[in-house]
Amino acid sequence: FTHIYDELVMQEELICGLAAPIITGNSCLGVLVVGHRKRTALTQANLDTLTLIANLLAVEITRDRAEESLQKSLEHLRTVFECTVNALSITAEKKDPYTAGHQRRVASLACAIAQEMKLPQYYIDNVRTASVLHDIGKLQIPTDILTKPGGLTEIERLLVKTHTQAGYEIVKTIPFAQAISTALLQHHERMDGSGYPQGLSGEEILLEARILAVADVVEAMASHRPYRPALGIESALEEIRQGAGIIYDAEVVEACLKVFSSKNFTF
């Protein structure tokens, strides 16, 4: 720095100058220097102004560095979160081999619906994560019930229904995942209040859960299950078409139908 300063002084024929360090914490990041060709041209007021500018620069640099550090921390947390989500999803699918891939197919459709609805990116991210995890609560359900080829008894049906609450209890412990855990809890709620576990209706149901409900039904009906063969996409779409505004959110259904008819969506 000194040789640059010396060259500048000689080149510009400066005979007086002021300097104010840019300090953050215990570090000096640089120095603001002002020079003049007249010996008496610079005053204490000039030095005060230069010092103020140096301090403002220090604040801005500190803030930028803090924001950069925070961004890196958030990216790390996001990576850890995504790895956790993937691990939980794989664990759930191993529990029920008949629905292997179900959660990811639901996520694919649910995200396409959210995008068709022109929702902000954070909604789409929540929908994706909730979809990938929506059956995580089935980890507590015995495998022989999940894979039972015939109809379930009333007690078995009630036991299967507990997976929404169980999934909520698992995911609610993850930081920043309140909307996701709530979507897991509510994805079997229905617009007319006929769903479970709380019998919510209309906009009492989180939007992410309303989207997940439609995507889940379509994928489930279109795919093979231990107790029935696949019913096909057309039957699944007719189901949500007839239930639009009654048991399924009408706007979500409209977006889902458009995804298949206009966007040629496939699982």
Where do the protein language model's features map onto the residues?
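Metal-dependent catalytic cores of enzymes that make or break cyclic nucleotides
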Residues: 44, 73-76, 82-267
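Sensor-regulatory modules in signal-transduction proteins
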Residues: 22-25, 39
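Allosteric cytosolic regulatory segments
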Residues: 51-58
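Signal-transducing coupling segments at domain and membrane junctions
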Residues: 1-16, 36, 190-201
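Short beta-strand-to-loop transition segments that serve as allosteric relay/switch motifs
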Residues: 31-41, 149
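Glycine-rich acetyl-CoA-binding "A-motif" of GNAT/NAT acetyltransferases
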Residues: 28
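Heptad-repeat alpha-helical coiled-coil signal-transmission segments
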Residues: 57, 63-66, 70, 77, ...
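A short, aliphatic-rich beta-strand micro-motif
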Residues: 15-23
